Curated annotation (Swiss-Prot):
Residues 555-626 are annotated as: C. InterPro entries: HATPase_C_sf, Heat_shock_protein_90_CS, HSP90_C, Hsp90_fam, Hsp90_N, Ribosomal_Su5_D2-typ_SF. It comes from Mannheimia succiniciproducens (strain KCTC 0769BP / MBEL55E). NCBIfam families: PRK05218.1. This is Chaperone protein HtpG. Homodimer.
Length: 626
């Protein structure tokens, strides 16, 4: 019956085991939390399947987790009577990691123990955490609904391989036995185990029982009994007033498998047209796969306290995919499926309500705890920027949450909101001015800012890759248009001063110069014109309002899409000494060299690169040698 075979671990499992034992050793007691959490999940899955197949309970519907130890053998056992596993499932779940992006995750790990610990926690170590304290682990399991002789024994020393064989197992569920290392015998102590379970698993909605000794009236040991040691009431069903912050934090870690505390949470019970309870969390750290579109996200879904599914993504818009938590609805049917959820009025109403609550949470965090919000923005700001394109109904509320670097702060930290900017707008200023660039340094030092710096007009400095795309959906805020300072047809309106209005005479002197430049460059540029927006720079290139910007063209190129040709307007500063010098050159070849120099400088400042940098270097060298 044994049919024993020995298999090698998947490469990624080997790596994860080695890294985990090294990185998580200082927080080793979490292995018990992880194993109890898995047992709780197994019970949830059995309850769900038994909705349509009650015979799976096999006459034992009293679901629980049990913990026992044998100090003589040095073993600790965690068992449950949940869904159980077949032989194939044991191999799939315990011998391989099925998550997409695992290789990328492992490559992100380095030698920083604290950082690695956080990353591994986010990835979800689950069962493998047993090897932090054990040098051998045995798993005995039988799936619900299969014969007793279809049990499986999986065993490993956590090194390169594991064995798997068929066994007879009378009881449904899974039993995990840890053979503890010599220096981990502290976990063979009932009070130590009670302490850990009280700390990490008191909120589990499943009884956690420990095998404890019984004593007679004379104090002599008379036997053993199973004793429940947790509240065994689903945390979200309890009154908010009786739940401590620590309990909320530990429950977050239970449902998210994160090691870090959440930044914020909101617990609501709603009655009326809809009846549901929601418990939403804002994590403190972005998961390693936040930008992996294939990775599932969403809330845990319960219907009338019965677990239905993990990652019910339909209740949260994609731009809030970082939110964690659960929804317990009284209005959805118990036999609900992902397909039914997709096209359901109740679902749509719940999604709308939960989106609103999530945005309110973030608004409150930004207002009441700006330091925590700064952490949130650093971790999740890029994802939130997708919101104005996805959620038109909440566009203004989402944009209110955005933060940017600004010329006002002289710092790369993104901590300026649109409301901050508007509160500092100059008298007569009608627009919110911004610039997009590849980096904060490039934005801050752009020649397009020279006039704004001179006049003391604040400009938002945007350097995230998504910014240009975001701005194509967000053209105004609070009735104020958002205006790029790089546009050729930039209009400062009432902020234009008399000095600029009286420069026509000077412009006329340069008319013939401008015509020479136009003739020389021809179709290479859209237009050539005099500009007074520059103070220290001889020339810039700019695009019209209806043209694709440089940053958007770069986005297209990076995504492999065809990029329309961008023809720039060449703007020349008549006050600059280089321009004055070029205007005096009569030799057409030399004049062409000077104009080529000015145009290439402007293109380099705008785009960050040139099509032919070698030719530009030769040109600069030739002019310097004269």
């Amino acid at each position: 019956m044994s049919n024993k075979e020995t298999c090698g671990f998947q490469t990624e499992v080997k790596q994860l085991l080695q890294l985990m034992i090294h990185s998580l050793y200082s927080n080793k007691e979490i292995f018990l939390r992880e194993l109890i959490s898995n047992a709780s999940d197994a019970a949830d899955k059995l309850r769900f399947k038994a909705l349509s197949a009650p015979e799976l309970y096999e006459g034992d519907g009293d679901l629980k987790v049990r913990i026992s130890f044998d100090d003589k053998k040095g073993t600790l056992t965690v068992s449950d009577n949940g869904i159980g596993m077949t032989r194939e499932q044991a191999v799939d779940h315990l011998g391989t990691i099925a998550k997409s992006g695992t290789k990328e995750f492992l490559s992100a790990l380095g030698n920083d123990q604290a950082k690695d610990s956080q990353l591994i926690g986010q990835f979800g170590v689950g069962f493998y955490s047993a090897f932090i304290v054990a040098d051998k682990v045995e798993v005995r399991s039988r799936a619900a609904g299969v014969a007793a002789d279809k049990g499986v024994l999986w065993a490993s020393a956590g090194e390169g391989e594991y064995s798997v064989e068929n066994i007879e197992k009378k009881d449904r569920g899974t039993e995990i036995t840890l053979f503890l290392r010599e220096d981990e015998k502290e976990f063979l102590n009932e009070w130590r185990l009670r302490e850990i379970i009280g700390k990490y698993s008191d909120h589990i909605g499943l009884p956690v029982e420990i095998l404890t000794k019984e004593y007679d009236e004379e104090g002599k040991e008379s036997g053993v009994k199973w004793e429940k040691i947790n509240k065994a009431q689903a945390l979200w069903t309890r009154s908010k007033a009786e739940i401590s912050d620590d309990e909320y934090k530990e429950f977050y870690k239970h449902i998210s498998h994160d090691f870090a505390d959440p930044l914020s949470w909101m617990h609501n019970k709603v009655e009326g047209n809809q009846e549901y309870t929601s418990l939403l969390y804002v994590p403190g750290k972005a998961p390693w796969d936040l930008f992996n579109r294939e990775q599932k996200h969403g809330l845990k879904l319960y219907v009338q306290r019965v677990f239905i599914m993990d990652d019910a993504e339909v209740f949260m818009p994609n731009y809030l995919r970082f939110m964690r938590g659960l929804l317990d609805s009284n209005d959805l049917p118990l036999n609900v499926s992902r397909e039914i959820l997709q096209d359901n009025k109740t679902t749509a109403a719940l999604r709308k309500a939960l989106t609103k609550r999530s945005l309110q949470m973030l608004e409150k965090l930004a207002k009441d705890e700006p330091e925590k919000y700064a952490v949130f923005w650093k971790e999740f700001g890029l994802v939130l920027k997708e919101g104005v394109a996805e959620d038109f109904a909440n566009k203004e509320q989402i944009a209110k949450l955005y933060r940017f670097a600004s010329t006002h702060t002289d710092s790369s930290e993104q901590n300026v909101s649109f409301e901050d900017y508007i509160s500092r707008m100059k008298e007569g200023q009608k627009a919110v001015y911004y610039i997009t660039a590849d980096s904060y340094v490039a934005a801050k030092n752009s020649p397009h800012l020279e006039l704004f710096n001179k006049k003391g007009i604040e400009v938002l400095l945007l350097s995230d890759r998504i910014d240009e795309w975001m701005l194509s959906y967000l053209t105004e805020f609070d009735g104020k248009p958002l205006q790029s300072v790089t546009k050729a047809d930039l209009d400062l309106g009432d902020l234009a001063d008399k000095e600029e209005e009286n420069q026509k005479e000077q412009d006329e002197k340069f008319d013939s110069f401008i015509q020479r430049v136009k003739s020389l460059l021809g179709e290479r540029v859209k237009d050539v014109r005099i500009t007074h927006r520059l103070t220290d720079t001889p020339a810039v290139v700019s695009t019209d309002n209806d043209q694709m910007t440089t940053q958007m063209a770069k986005l297209f190129a990076m995504s492999g899409q065809p990029v329309p040709e961008v023809k720039y307007t060449f703007e020349i500063n008549p006050q600059h000494e280089l321009v004055k010098k070029a205007a005096k050159v009569t030799d057409e070849t030399e004049f062409g060299d000077w104009i080529e120099l000015l145009l290439n400088q402007a293109m380099l400042a705008e785009r960050g690169s040139l099509e032919n940098p070698v030719a530009f270097i030769k040109l600069v060298n030739a002019l310097l040698a004269k």
